[in-house]
Amino acid sequence: MNSKIIRFENLRSFFKDGMTIMIGGFLNCGTPTKLIDFLVNLNIKNLTIISNDTCYPNTGIGKLISNNQVKKLIASYIGSNPDTGKKLFNNELEVELSPQGTLVERIRAGGSGLGGVLTKTGLGTLIEKGKKKISINGTEYLLELPLTADVALIKGSIVDEAGNTFYKGTTKNFNPYMAMAAKTVIVEAENLVSCEKLEKEKAMTPGVLINYIVKEPA
């Protein structure tokens, strides 16, 4: 079996301007901060970022916002980062807000090859603008389109050398769903162990979905 473990400098060829990147985490809980720092140092631009939030100014995903690397953001919450709001109102950043449950279902749909998600969330609000409505048995739904990415950056609490990944507590959040929905998946391992050290029933993301593992500081 070829090793999935890779050094940060060998990831450079995977990233370029204009990419769509999913980043796991919830206000920096379960967020691959070393991989984000790596992206900041690469200074690639015009990115579309799919994430739950943009954390805080100059923290986590907020570093990408502060460094003017993001062209479009698809997220459920931006209130904790004033920089995101300023860029939105100054027309420096396109923001698509998606309710949190809808966002994760759109990601799950993308990973499962589904054509979209039907939901009543957002009906009668600004969320429905420009979206198709479908009536089923007399009930109206919004059609939310699936989300996929070129690369997903996720974080695992324990990752074995085959890529099987365990998330501790709420660090799970968006990570396992994003691992299903991208062409290339890179996991930042908090603890990297040999294959026999992680009980397979604890693997929340199977190694077959993981392309690369990083551990050392960027």
From Swiss-Prot:
It catalyses: acetoacetate + butanoyl-CoA = acetoacetyl-CoA + butanoate; acetoacetate + acetyl-CoA = acetoacetyl-CoA + acetate. CoA binds at G24, G25, F26, L27, N28, C29, G30. Induction: Transcriptionally induced or derepressed before the onset of solventogenesis. The acetate and butyrate conversion reactions are inhibited in vitro by physiological levels of acetone and butanol. Shows at least 80% of maximal activity from pH 5.9 to greater than 7.8 for acetate conversion. It holds the Pfam family CoA_trans. It comes from the Bacteria. Keywords: Plasmid, Transferase. The keyword Transferase applies. The keyword Transferase applies. SUPFAM superfamilies: NagB/RpiA/CoA transferase-like (SSF100950). Its EC number is 2.8.3.9. InterPro entries: 3-oxoacid_CoA-transf_A, CoA_trans_fam_I, CoA_transf_BS, NagB/RpiA_transferase-like. NCBIfam families: pcaI_scoA_fam. Catalyzes the transfer of CoA from acetoacetyl-CoA to acetate, butyrate and propionate. Also shows low activity with valerate, isobutyrate and crotonate. Plays an important role in the metabolic shift between the acid-producing and solvent-forming states of C.acetobutylicum. Acts mainly to detoxify the medium by removing the acetate and butyrate excreted earlier in the fermentation. Heterotetramer composed of two alpha subunits (CtfA) and two beta subunits (CtfB). Belongs to the 3-oxoacid CoA-transferase subunit A family. This is Acetoacetyl-CoA:acetate/butyrate CoA transferase alpha subunit. It comes from Clostridium acetobutylicum (strain ATCC 824 / DSM 792 / JCM 1419 / IAM 19013 / LMG 5710 / NBRC 13948 / NRRL B-527 / VKM B-1787 / 2291 / W).
